[in-house]
Amino acid sequence: MLAGGRGVPPSHLLAPGDEVEVHPVPRPQPLPGEPRFLLDVHLGTLARRLRLLGVDTAYHNDMDDPALVVQANEERRVLLTQDRGLLRRRALWLGAYIRGSAPSDQLRDLLERFAPPLRPWTRCTACNGVLRPVTKDEVEPLLEAGTRRSYDAYGRCGSCGQVYWHGAHSGHLEEIVRMATAWSA
């Protein structure tokens, strides 16, 4: 928003005769540094999808609003929510309202708005830790017999130890990655 030819915040008080220009926020919306997000308790599915895509995404299903603001500020994360009241908190460093009720609509909104770099299959969907490739021998004691027989390629979270492989569920996940990649192009 411009008033009198200079950028002003929405709270700016106009003087008589001021001319106001309002421009849309550019897309993708510029952020300081690589996008890092913190999602509120109502966006758990979106959080898992962002992690699947390799986007640095913090999420806790039991964190109250003041704690979310503190974490977002301390870690310089964009707080994503559908709670407009949360976004109005003065102490919040940076936040964004996520549009849509379906997780696919929410994901598309976020990808089109912020265009984070996608690195699919590199983050743990449970804790956001970084995945690393591991040998079957390293994780064999953790696997059920059918999994050991059927799969040879594995990844493991360096933070929580969760083991990943391209199992029967991977078709659905690959479709999410395919759609997200198309939306980000």
Regions found by a protein language model. Name each.
Residues C124-C127, C157-C160:
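Short cysteine-rich clusters marking metal-coordination/redox-active sites
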Residues M1-S11:
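A basic, amphipathic helix-loop patch mediating RNA/tRNA/ribosome contacts
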Residues A15-V20:
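Loop/turn positions that initiate beta-strands
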Residues M63-E75, L86-L87:
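BRCT (BRCA1 C-terminal) domain core and associated BRCT-interaction motifs
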Residues S11, P141-A153:
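Short linker/helix segments within small regulatory modules
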Residues V25, Q29-A58, H166-S184:
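Extended interfacial segments that mediate partner engagement and assembly in macromolecular machines
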Residues G129-P133, W165:
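Short functional micro-motifs and their immediate structural scaffolds
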Residues P117-W121, S150-A153:
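Short metal-coordination and nucleic-acid-contact micro-motifs, chiefly zinc-binding Cys/His arrays
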